[in-house]
């Protein structure tokens, strides 16, 4: 009885998967070498493991030449095929490509919002969770950076305001000091020891020359009394001082 067809599917056991990869890789490299020797063909083989490790094989170790040749051929083939292609077909392919991209973006957006999660496998959910955690870390980092910059800006403004207040306070103190010095100098000038006190405003008026000769002043009368404040006595004394000497003089003349 022959052996049945083995169903191709992913090997879940990690160790078995690694062993199978090593065996199949060795067989694949052997087949590439055989075809290059038997058929005189230029062969280039590139294999990446699930961990990202590179395995390659090329005829006569000329991988770069084979890749350059492949690139030139692909570019030339595209240039030849492009003019012959139908324009409508290109637009249809572009439309389908963009439509598929839009559907993928919409599905990812729903997943990010926590919607349509029933059809996702545990591995897909784990990947989605990791993406959301990474996005949250970026968001928190950016938010903290903005808050830190805002705090620094506010601290700079506060420092500038404090410096301005200190400068204004010093200016006010200096002006008060100057004002006090000027006030003390003014008081010393107005209240000096050799300067009489200022007169009231009405006494600073200029008097008429006639009034200078009619100011009351003290004098003696013939009776020997000192008169100063009585106006009637002043008039009487004026008369006595004026006429009595004349009368005495006349009497003396007659007696002689």
UniProtKB/Swiss-Prot annotation:
It holds the Pfam family K-box. InterPro entries: MADS-box/MEF2_TF (IPR050142), MEF2-like_N (IPR033896), TF_Kbox (IPR002487), TF_MADSbox (IPR002100), TF_MADSbox_sf (IPR036879). The keyword Transcription applies. GO terms for cellular component: nucleus. Residues 1-61 form the MADS-box domain. GO terms for molecular function: DNA-binding transcription factor activity; protein dimerization activity; RNA polymerase II transcription regulatory region sequence-specific DNA binding. Residues 88-178 form the K-box domain. Its main location: nucleus. Keywords: Activator, Coiled coil, Developmental protein, Differentiation, DNA-binding, Flowering, Nucleus, Transcription, Transcription regulation. It is found in: Nucleus. GO terms for biological process: cell differentiation; flower development; positive regulation of transcription by RNA polymerase II. Transcription factor that promotes early floral meristem identity in synergy with LEAFY. Displays a redundant function with CAULIFLOWER in the up-regulation of LEAFY. Required subsequently for the transition of an inflorescence meristem into a floral meristem, and for the normal development of sepals and petals in flowers. Regulates positively B class homeotic proteins. Homodimer capable of binding to CArG-box sequences. This is Floral homeotic protein APETALA 1. It comes from Citrus sinensis.
């Amino acid at each position: 009885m022959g052996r049945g067809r083995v169903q191709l599917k992913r090997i879940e056991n990690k160790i078995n998967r690694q062993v199978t990869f090593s065996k199949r890789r060795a067989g694949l490299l052997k087949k590439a070498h055989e075809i290059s020797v038997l058929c005189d063909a230029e062969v280039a083989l590139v294999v990446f493991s699930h961990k990202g490790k590179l395995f390659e094989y090329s005829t006569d170790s000329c991988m770069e030449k084979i890749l350059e040749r492949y690139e030139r051929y692909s570019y030339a083939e595209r240039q030849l095929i492009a003019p012959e292609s139908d324009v409508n077909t290109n637009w249809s392919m572009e439309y389908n490509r963009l439509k598929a991209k839009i559907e993928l973006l919409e599905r990812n957006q729903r997943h990010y919002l926590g919607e349509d999660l029933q059809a996702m496998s545990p591995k897909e959910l784990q990947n989605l969770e990791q993406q959301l955690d990474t996005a949250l870390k970026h968001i928190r980092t950016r938010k903290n950076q903005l808050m830190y910059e805002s705090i620094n800006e506010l601290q700079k403004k506060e420092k500038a305001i404090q410096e301005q207040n200190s400068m204004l306070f010093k200016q006010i103190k200096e002006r008060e000091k100057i004002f006090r010095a000027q006030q003390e100098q003014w008081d010393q000038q107005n209240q000096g020891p050799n300067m009489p006190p200022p007169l009231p405003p009405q006494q600073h008026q200029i008097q008429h020359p006639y009034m200078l000769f009619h100011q009351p002043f003290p004098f003696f009368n013939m009776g020997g009394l000192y008169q100063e404040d009585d106006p009637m006595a002043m008039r009487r004394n004026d008369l006595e001082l004026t006429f009595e000497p004349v009368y005495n003089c006349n009497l003396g003349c007659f007696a002689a």
